[in-house]
């Protein structure tokens, strides 16, 4: 028997991490304890999960946690180590409701492959229930009402007419640049595999694009690009269920 501890150190609170720590108290195969060092409203936070058991189930636990704890832009370090005695607890961490955290996309690694992959049987099921992130609870009635047929029609309109007002998301999409103003142009990346063909990116920028927050990042187009003429662009991946599915259709 050995004790291990898995740490996730963040520069600020990440409500989803606290929620996932709480969920792992239900992991019956091992003795689990959890905690958060410096768990307050400001400053660095280290979320941790401790487990006691034999080598094989401990390895299975570590693999499961690595899959569940998706990258956050606020994550600064993570690790696993052997400890002498657990320091955590069996009580739930106090946390803000992750469903109300607007900085995190309303989908995760469990539900996205089901509704966001064009080869999946439930592709386009915007209101798909997820037992992990519960992203469906954060959808508006207008978002929930959209079907795959609706989204395909929107994509067709964008392709044929050149623009689309996506009222349920409060945005407009266009195949051509909008009228220039003081702000940087913003681009939705529909095919992540083409990133390096268009932009000069570092590894940490690619990781940030794929993080649970799905942020806009500033990127410079490659030299002599035939269509991207601005010096800098704000780019992002699909950051909501609707935009993610629409991106997959347009891909």
Predicted regions and their residues:
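Residue-level signal for inorganic ion chemistry
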Residues: 65, 130, 217
């Amino acid at each position: 028997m050995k004790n291990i501890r898995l740490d996730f150190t963040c520069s600020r609170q990440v409500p989803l991490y606290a929620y996932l720590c709480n969920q792992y108290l239900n992991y019956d195969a091992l003795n689990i304890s959890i905690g958060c060092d410096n768990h307050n409203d400001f400053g660095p936070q280290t979320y941790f999960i401790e487990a006691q058991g034999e080598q094989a189930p401990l390895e299975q636990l570590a693999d499961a946690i690595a899959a569940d704890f998706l990258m956050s832009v606020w994550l600064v370090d993570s690790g696993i180590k052997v400890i002498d005695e657990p320091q955590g607890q069996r009580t739930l961490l106090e946390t803000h409701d992750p469903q109300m955290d607007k900085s995190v996309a309303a989908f995760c690694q469990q539900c996205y492959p089901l509704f966001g992959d064009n080869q999946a049987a439930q592709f386009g099921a915007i209101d798909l229930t997820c037992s992990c992130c519960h992203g469906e609870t954060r959808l508006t009635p207008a978002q929930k009402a959209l079907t795959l047929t609706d989204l395909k029609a929107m994509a067709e309109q964008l392709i044929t007419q050149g623009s689309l007002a996506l009222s349920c998301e409060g945005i407009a999409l266009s195949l051509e640049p909008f009228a220039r103003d003081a702000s940087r142009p913003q681009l939705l990346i529909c095919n992540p595999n083409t990133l390096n063909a268009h932009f000069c990116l570092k590894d940490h920028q690619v990781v940030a694009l794929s993080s649970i927050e799905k942020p806009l990042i500033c990127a410079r187009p490659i030299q002599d690009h035939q269509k991207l003429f601005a010096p800098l662009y704000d780019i992002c991946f699909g950051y909501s269920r609707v935009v993610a599915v629409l991106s997959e259709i347009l891909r």
